[in-house]
Amino acid sequence: MASHKWLLQMIVFLKTITIAYCLHLQDDTPLFFGAKPLSDVSLIITEPCVSSVYEAWDYAAPPVSNLSEALSGIVVKTKCPVPEVILWFKDKQMAYWTNPYVTLKGLTQSVGEEHKSGDIRDALLDALSGVWVDSTPSSTNIPENGCVWGADRLFQRVCQ
């Protein structure tokens, strides 16, 4: 039963990503940062953080019409200065790095949309709500050249 709830939450989450991507067409906030061909999902963890090789990445959205059918998994890398959220497509052997702020906000909203309570939902809501309580409004735009994300002010841009 718990696995069914998780599946339903992921479907809602993927719909939220799709909606956010459609909104991207009208907004300057990109959802997808870059794409890279990788033969195995385990290679995602060994990749350097996007922020350290930013210029080398191609901007691309997954070439699929229905993310929920083609998506094989979601990886969250927390070892980077800014956590990274990566969508993995096994059939295409491609990984797509997403805007972590937009993606995590979509995850928070999708978990919150389910009206039935359950152990998994409650645990996720508790964990995710703590993240957003103390956060200040921040730009989800990609930093311009010469800008870095300050470690002490993770959610603010620092430009020289």
Swiss-Prot record:
Keywords of the record, alphabetical order, are:
Disulfide bond, Fusion of virus membrane with host cell membrane, Fusion of virus membrane with host membrane, Glycoprotein, Host cell membrane, Host Golgi apparatus, Host membrane, Membrane, Signal, Viral envelope protein, Viral penetration into host cytoplasm, Virion, Virus entry into host cell
Q: What residue stretches are annotated with the gL alphaherpesvirus-type domain?
A: 28-160
Q: Record keywords: Membrane included?
A: yes
- How does the protein's chain sit in the membrane according to the entry? Peripheral membrane protein
Q: Which residues form the signal peptide?
A: 1-22
Return the InterPro entries for the record.
Herpes_gL_N, Herpes_gL_N_sf, HSV_GL_alphagamma
**One GO cellular component from the entry?**
host cell Golgi apparatus
Annotated region Interaction with gH: the residues are 24-149
Subcellular location field:
Virion membrane; Host cell membrane; Host Golgi apparatus, Host trans-Golgi network
- Disulfide linkage: 49-80, 147-159
Q: Respond yes or no to whether keyword Signal is given for this record.
A: yes
Query: What's the stated role of this polypeptide?
Result: The heterodimer glycoprotein H-glycoprotein L is required for the fusion of viral and plasma membranes leading to virus entry into the host cell. Acts as a functional inhibitor of gH and maintains gH in an inhibited form. Upon binding to host integrins, gL dissociates from gH leading to activation of the viral fusion glycoproteins gB and gH.
Task: Kindly state the subunit structure of this protein.
Answer: Interacts with glycoprotein H (gH); this interaction is necessary for the correct processing and cell surface expression of gH. The heterodimer gH/gL seems to interact with gB trimers during fusion.
Indicate what this protein is called per its UniProt record. Answer: Envelope glycoprotein L
Which gene holds the coding sequence for this protein?
A: gL
